[in-house]
């Protein structure tokens, strides 16, 4: 497997790098209907036009891959976007530059909220995080949120 490819992390949710996110063949092959881009570059009109022509719903979030960045400000909007599309059976692609840190953090956030917080589990937050991270890394071994994002996830859900 090349990690430029799209990787399915769980049903209807995929992760990739930036280059794959603009590859029409890959998007069609995986029937991607919604995309979250979490990047530092501004969206280009060509990409927006392609997504619109292909009836792909997109959410653009701007964030550097630095431990000091506040990724939690995007937890609610990304969760709601993914959840809305999953409920209608759409395939969602979440990507950043490399498909390693920012995008994986948003997917882990979704899984933590959906299956543990809303599910009412009594497990410790750190254990839940490690379990979900392990699942994601089995699917895509290069997944590795930076230390700041890891801490943000644990702290955010420790308060819930």
Regions found by a protein language model. Give the residues of each.
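Cysteine-based protein phosphatase catalytic domain of the PTP/DSP
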Residues: 2-92, 112-155
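A phosphate-binding catalytic loop at a beta-strand-loop-alpha-helix junction
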Residues: 91-108
């Amino acid at each position: 497997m090349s990690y430029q490819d799209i990787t399915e992390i769980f049903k209807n949710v995929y992760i990739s790098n930036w280059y794959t996110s603009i590859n029409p063949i890959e998007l069609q092959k995986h029937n991607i209907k919604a995309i979250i881009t979490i990047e530092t570059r501004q969206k280009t009109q060509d990409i927006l036009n392609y997504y619109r022509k292909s009836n792909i719903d997109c959410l653009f979030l701007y964030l550097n891959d630095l431990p000091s960045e506040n990724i939690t400000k995007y937890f609610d909007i990304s969760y709601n976007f993914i959840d809305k599309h999953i409920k209608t059976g759409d395939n969602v692609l979440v990507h950043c530059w490399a498909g390693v840190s920012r995008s994986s953090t948003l997917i882990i956030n979704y899984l933590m909220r959906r299956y543990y917080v809303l599910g009412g589990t009594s497990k410790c937050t750190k254990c839940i995080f490690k379990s979900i991270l392990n699942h994601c890394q089995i699917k895509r071994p290069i997944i590795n949120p930076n230390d700041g994002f890891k801490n943000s996830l644990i702290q955010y859900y420790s308060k819930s």
